[in-house]
């Protein structure tokens, strides 16, 4: 086929969508169809005829519909890919093909609509005015982290004194819930073990057990949150729970002294432990500060650069987010049928966030291209080594276990950080005092 005889017109439907219109001369269609029939002739089995010797009219009698479908498929596929190459179109979605089939002695017309990445000329990323929190570690934060470590080595002991329940206690309870006049099975539990203050239950449930004693039968009234994901059928509704308090335990913590340090091989003294805690907190603050700075930069960039996000990218991101959310719920032991019910509303819920993620990625990519920022092989290798160290794995095993998509994600993470660092290096950055936290918040 002489491709130059095929007329191709490109229409821009939107900044992220193009429509390719093809007009294929009848002679080219006929030639393609003849080729299809010749191929059929070599392989077709029709009673009374030898393979390769079947007359064309007999083939048409048996295979006309199939031959025309094959002709259309062959023409569309080849011409579509040739047109993308010729017009330098980088499609990011499967084409939406529109065609009416072949008509004898008539040119064959079809169209292919595809999504493309928007052409972005990034603005406003140079000379930004930004604020950054100082990276300091307070004694309250160190004390809070040490308290967390003590709790890891605490032991649960039954409370024998006649006292009220307080925050941090562990209770064993039976409960049943009533909503809309019903007493559903999923709102009943026996011997349920609960840490008061863990926020495991619906907001307000645990607070209403404070001050109560073992043996009490307590009526608790709550309102399910409007965005309650575990069961959307009860979201926003009033409910009453009948709770029987059966047992009370408290966690006894070890003294924070030199003897406590013997629980760890890597520390020789309490001061060593405190210093390591301080370093860990500093790294936590550093990561948080970088994340906060990246968000500030991204907020400004998105405000100054308005463009459409390709729907195929957004849908792909929504799908990924839904799968991750589903995995998290599966690990909680939630019934799959309940997960299906809950996830019905996730698509709309995640759409705005997914759109932001897609637009952010495209915008950072455009800045990287404009400023010739890329990821070197050395940077990629070093990041893989960091991942191996983080998970205490052999570097070669980590490297071999990463498929191409995973490697691309690592490269994108490195590239995004380099772009953020570049923007920050060109910005006017003022340091602000770190917001003070209480010991409870630090904990």
Curated annotation (Swiss-Prot):
InterPro entries attached to this UniProt entry: PPIase_dom_sf (IPR046357), PPIase_FKBP_dom (IPR001179), Trig_fac (IPR005215), Trigger_fac_C (IPR008880), Trigger_fac_C_sf (IPR037041), Trigger_fac_ribosome-bd_bac (IPR008881), Trigger_fac_ribosome-bd_sf (IPR036611), Trigger_fact/SurA_dom_sf (IPR027304)
Domain PPIase FKBP-type intervals: 168-254
Signal peptide start and end residues: none
Highest taxon listed in the record's lineage: Bacteria
Pfam families noted in UniProt: FKBP_C (PF00254), Trigger_C (PF05698), Trigger_N (PF05697)
Record's catalysed reaction(s): [protein]-peptidylproline (omega=180) = [protein]-peptidylproline (omega=0)
GO-annotated cellular components: cytoplasm
Top EC class of this enzyme: isomerase
Enzyme Commission number: 5.2.1.8
Gene Ontology BP terms: 'de novo' cotranslational protein folding; cell division; chaperone-mediated protein folding; protein transport; protein unfolding
MF-aspect GO terms: peptidyl-prolyl cis-trans isomerase activity; protein folding chaperone; ribosome binding
Localization of this protein: Cytoplasm
PROSITE patterns referenced in this protein's UniProt entry, alphabetically: FKBP_PPIASE (PS50059)
The entry's keywords: Cell cycle, Cell division, Chaperone, Cytoplasm, Isomerase, Rotamase
Gene3D superfamilies to which the protein is assigned, alphabetical: 3.10.50.40, Trigger factor ribosome-binding domain, Trigger factor, C-terminal domain
Function per UniProt: Involved in protein export. Acts as a chaperone by maintaining the newly synthesized protein in an open conformation. Functions as a peptidyl-prolyl cis-trans isomerase.
Notes on the domains: Consists of 3 domains; the N-terminus binds the ribosome, the middle domain has PPIase activity, while the C-terminus has intrinsic chaperone activity on its own.
HAMAP family tied to this protein: Trigger_factor_Tig
The family this protein is said to belong to: Belongs to the FKBP-type PPIase family. Tig subfamily.
Protein name per UniProt: Trigger factor
Gene designation per UniProt: tig
